[in-house]
Amino acid sequence: MSQTGSHPGRGLAGRWLWGAQPCLLLPIVPLSWLVWLLLLLLASLLPSARLASPLPREEEIVFPEKLNGSVLPGSGAPARLLCRLQAFGETLLLELEHDSGVQVEGLTVQYLGQAPELLGGAEPGTYLTGTINGEPESVASLHWDGGALLGVLQYRGAELHLQPLEGGTPNSAGGPGAHILRRKSPASGQGPMCNVKAPLGSPSPRPRRAKRFASLSRFVETLVVADDKMAAFHGAGLKRYLLTVMAAAAKAFKHPSIRNPVSLVVTRLVILGSGEEGPQVGPSAAQTLRSFCAWQRGLNTPEDSDPDHFDTAILFTRQDLCGVSTCDTLGMADVGTVCDPARSCAIVEDDGLQSAYTAAHELGHVFNMLHDNSKPCISLNGPLSTSRHVMAPVMAHVDPEEPWSPCSARFITDFLDNGYGHCLLDKPEAPLHLPVTFPGKDYDADRQCQLTFGPDSRHCPQLPPPCAALWCSGHLNGHAMCQTKHSPWADGTPCGPAQACMGGRCLHMDQLQDFNIPQAGGWGPWGPWGDCSRTCGGGVQFSSRDCTRPVPRNGGKYCEGRRTRFRSCNTEDCPTGSVLTFREEQCAAYNHCTDLFKSFPGPMDWVPRYTGVAPQDQCKLTCQARALGYYYVLEPRVVDGTPCSPDSSSVCVQGRCIHAGCDRIIGSKKKFDKCMVCGGDGSGCSKQSGSFRKFRYGYNNVVTIPTGATHILVRQQGNPGHRSIYLALKLPDGSYALNGEYTLMPSPTDVVLPGAISLRYSGATAASETLSGHGPLAQPLTLQVLVAGNPQDARLRYSFFVPRPTPSTPHPTPQDWLHRRAQILEILRRRPWVGRK
């Protein structure tokens, strides 16, 4: 998918394209030269241009017969099931029991509209395991959907795949309950390339603020929706297929490379029929996403604690999705919207089992992840490849050892640390246990080809190496050929005698046990303290630890708890020669960036903007162009250690305002008193207050606020509809800092004064005109009022604190010295002599 937009914030669309290398015979990307060469060679060897036969297999239409069984209390799902079928000249008796390991607990399944191919088996279904003909070495693993069986049988060295035919409905081959049973023998390693087998004649069914810098369990309660095209294509196997895809996506989110404990939980499954007025699904991916996002909100409940509530929704469709100029899009989602009920949604074009990575990719966008080729990611990922991770813009194969790039891990961590994942902290009461078997056990290579390229496609064997890329049969201009989308075989797909695929490699069955046992992670030691973010004035330094002792494996639990700690450093005052505050320096760094305003020539004077900035945005670098008055967020974060505001001693740490004392120590309880003395008792200053009512036209002097004044507050009240007086500030040199030259500032603003001091002004049009600031002033200010009319009912009051004069010690006069001398002599005369006999 290609992401549109350039800002990492919420609201941008993300799209994904499969096939970093060419995808053959598909409109997504052009044909590979290697396959064209293969076709030419085959055409020269085979006059008919038909490729040779694939792996040996046999197929039969069978009619499973339910003999007896019992149901689970309160659910209606079978606890035991005895089933018989005739195949390959033999009677197979399946003795099945309910498998609690893949029980679908807490899953709500809804069928909306008319979908006759599904309604015959619309019960939620259950998973059954057992034996065949009582032989202990045999294995039956099936999904029972009320009238259809789907799964794998392993019997006497053969592997048999059982699935409903035409959704279990009547067809030309037999009566109700018709299934197809395919017997597949192990690959012999010999034989011709492959052959395009005749088609079977029908498609095969198929919160709010979390602790900062802490690793907390997140549960993404997900609504999964399948449209009518999905129902028509997959038939009775749709539900099992969706759960298999979501299980693979959930497995990706469990990988430790994401550096967060994220659990993808499917809580509701909705299947749409042709008669349902659902979302408008069409070729335009953007319009489909907008329609689905609006539609899914109507299914949600507002309370996060409600069992029917979901945190995000994902739509699967067989519709070919298109972007602005091409139809390369396989999915789309808004960025950074996971807890926004109106926009936490994604769409996925079903493309076979690899759709699990499309779903993971789109949900990655919902978690604020960017594409790995974006500018921020290139700097974070370093020289790593941008095409081997889940968030690659165009991808052929996900690295099983590191599916998430460092950039993806960084963005989701920052996103959650900043409180955007508050809705994910509640643990579902009845979690859904997704299928635990490897998908390749339920969907062999032939089935994977059908899911990807259509019902007529089959696996092309003996194209080395096995497991690395799935090659499937197809036709081009009437000629048989093999094609691939470069995705690996699904994990668990048989690839040889007693061998199966895992992570794109063909391994012995004994080695697969290493991938079945979950291993929880453990924290490693704390690392050393890093560099201080400031050289003076109070900086921040960090120390972190990783979940590496051991690293979690196979879906094992990721470490929980504090992963990063921080402390204050370099808290001493900066040199007195510093003219700008730390935030002013950061704004001034953009003064020579002329590309921000194309029509404004020359450098710009950027100053911090405090007024009108929401509390949650205090740690963004919001600066105002002094000449134009416009203000912008120039950086998503200020440098660590920057004060959150002029009126606070708290400091910004990784984009969050963290409490600090006036001594610049994070966590300290020291406060400024009214005199702006750190830890003082307020005795060093006195309050000065007064009012003013002698209004005359023009500028009127009210009071001179002296140097060192603190906690300044000026309030002017009157009839806002007929106001005729306004506050003004005059500097010692005669210039005006506010509302001079009969020019008013109508909106709220920060009045920047010499000495890196600022006062907050409400604006001339405010209902109550105010001017306030903590100080202390570096030079005196003259408070004035500008009278522009009849000042009826106008009232002005002011107050501030001024330092108390230090009492001077008078020099003693000669008389004082004589008096003190007499007192000392009298004391000495009265004392007894030490040692007198």
Swiss-Prot record:
GO terms for molecular function: metal ion binding; metalloendopeptidase activity; metallopeptidase activity; peptidase activity. Its EC number is 3.4.24.82. It is found in: Secreted, Extracellular space, Extracellular matrix. Zn(2+) binds at C194, H361, H365, H371. Its cofactor is Zn(2+). Residues 686-837 are annotated as: Spacer. The keyword Glycoprotein applies. GO terms for cellular component: extracellular matrix; extracellular region. Residues 218-428 form the Peptidase M12B domain. It comes from the Eukaryota. It is an enzyme of class 3 (hydrolase). Residues 437-519 form the Disintegrin domain. Keywords: Cleavage on pair of basic residues, Disulfide bond, Extracellular matrix, Glycoprotein, Hydrolase, Metal-binding, Metalloprotease, Protease, Secreted, Signal, Zinc, Zymogen. Its main location: secreted. Binds 1 zinc ion per subunit. Residues 1-51 form the signal peptide. A motif (Cysteine switch) lies at residues 192-199. Residues 52-212 form a propeptide. SUPFAM superfamilies: Metalloproteases ('zincins'), catalytic domain, TSP-1 type 1 repeat. The active site is at E362. Glycans are attached at N68. Residues 166-191 are annotated as: Disordered. Cleaves aggrecan, a cartilage proteoglycan, at the '392-Glu-|-Ala-393' site and may be involved in its turnover. Also cleaves COMP. May play an important role in the destruction of aggrecan in arthritic diseases. The spacer domain and the TSP type-1 domains are important for a tight interaction with the extracellular matrix. The spacer domain is also required for cleavage of COMP. Interacts with SRPX2. This is A disintegrin and metalloproteinase with thrombospondin motifs 4. The gene is ADAMTS4.
